[in-house]
Regions:
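Short proline/glycine- and basic residue-enriched helix-capping loop/turn segments at helix->loop/beta transitions
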Residues: 39-43
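Enriched for short, Lys/Arg-rich terminal
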Residues: 67, 71-103
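Arg/Lys-rich, positively charged N-terminal/basic patches that mediate binding to nucleic acids
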Residues: 1-32
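Short, hydrophobic secondary-structure boundary micro-motifs
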Residues: 29-30, 50-52, 91
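Basic/aromatic recognition patch in beta-strand/loop cores that engages polyanionic ligands
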Residues: 44-78
Length: 103
């Protein structure tokens, strides 16, 4: 199984890592490392996280107030959002129309 980010998810991941790195050197790298750790867990156990809408599942990051939202599409883990837990909780749903089928 492989993974890929939707372009919007990739951009918000990069923005969050830049933000954390600007706040304190090394924290941006810690954020990147945590996102990749969660992706590794998801790739090992893709159906373990709870479904939050249609085929989209959510996995919480440790030490950061973010969720990794993803869908399993054939042999690809499609990352829909790297979403802050306190900001605009459902903004990513508009991405589903073009990227996924809602069931």
């Amino acid at each position: 199984m492989i993974y890929e980010f939707l372009p919007e998810a990739d951009e918000e991941f990069r923005e969050a890592s830049r933000y954390y790195e600007n706040e304190a050197p090394g924290v941006g790298l810690a954020f990147i490392t945590e996102v990749h750790r969660v992706i590794s867990v998801v790739m090992l156990h893709p159906r373990a996280a709870k479904k939050v809408r249609g085929t989209v599942r959510s996995k919480v990051l440790f030490h950061f107030p973010y969720n990794l939202l993803y869908s399993i599409e054939s042999d690809v883990i499609l990352i829909v959002a790297v979403a802050h837990q306190k900001r605009r909780p459902t903004y990513w749903r508009s991405r589903l129309n073009t990227a996924l089928r809602i069931t």
